[in-house]
């Protein structure tokens, strides 16, 4: 009943505004920023820098606050979104694990609003949708970049285990911690570790 949901409109018939995050760093969600922001967080804590803490919190909060729109944008217009294209089109741990793990760490130390919806979104992907071998070990089966297909990468441990451990603490659900531990057994069995 009524008009479908929209986000931003101009005062003109059938005219909509689609936000675009042109910034290469602030408000972006990606693997390298997850690693970098994690380091910055613990640096800020160690040196007592409120400026760095505020920057990190604002960055992560912007990602949380715009995810709902980004998912709507993808559904409404199709294809990659102009905001959070990796998070709305997850096909690997690269797209979600590092940043989501850092997000939970930021929440632990600085507090974030609505972090649960994003944590659950990523947790659902990793636990229920990420490709796995028969014993549950993460595996790259069919991905956007074909050279990844049918491969196993040791860095998938980094992109999964810290998130799963923090998510287990966040939710209080032991199954995520068990999954994290089992990843080490599966990777050790197959890789030179």
List PLM regions with ranges.
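Low-complexity, Ser/Thr/Pro/Gly-enriched N-terminal "stalk/linker" regions
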Residues: 1-79, 113-121, 125-129, 133-136
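Carbohydrate-binding/catalytic loop surfaces
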Residues: 6-25, 74-104, 137-155, 193
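Solvent-exposed, acidic/flexible segments
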Residues: 29, 49, 92, 96, ...
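Well-ordered alpha-helical scaffold segments within catalytic/enzyme domains
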Residues: 34-50, 98-112, 159-173
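N-terminal glycine-rich cofactor-binding segment that shapes the pocket for flavin-like pterin cofactors
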Residues: 71, 84-124, 129
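Alpha-helix capping at helix-to-loop junctions
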Residues: 105-112, 124-135, 169, 173, ...
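Extended ligand-binding clefts on enzyme/binding-domain cores
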Residues: 133, 154-193
């Amino acid at each position: 009943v009524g008009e479908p949901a929209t986000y931003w409109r101009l005062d003109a018939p059938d005219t909509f505004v689609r936000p675009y995050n042109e910034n290469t760093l602030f408000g972006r969600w990606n693997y390298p920023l997850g690693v970098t922001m994690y380091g910055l967080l613990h640096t800020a804590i160690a040196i007592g820098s409120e400026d760095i803490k505020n920057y990190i919190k604002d960055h992560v909060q912007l990602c949380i606050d715009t995810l709902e729109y980004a998912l709507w944008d993808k559904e409404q217009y199709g294809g990659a979104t102009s905001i959070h294209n990796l998070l709305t089109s997850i096909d690997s741990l690269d797209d979600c694990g590092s940043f989501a793990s850092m997000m939970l760490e930021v929440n632990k130390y600085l507090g974030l609003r609505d972090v649960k919806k994003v944590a659950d979104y990523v947790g659902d992907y990793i636990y229920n949708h990420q490709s796995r071998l028969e014993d549950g070990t993460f595996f790259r089966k069919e991905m956007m970049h074909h050279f990844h297909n049918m491969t196993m990468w040791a860095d998938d441990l980094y992109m999964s285990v810290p998130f799963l451990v923090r998510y287990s603490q966040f939710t209080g659900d032991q199954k995520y911690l068990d999954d994290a531990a089992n990843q080490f057994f599966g990777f050790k069995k197959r890789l030179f570790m």
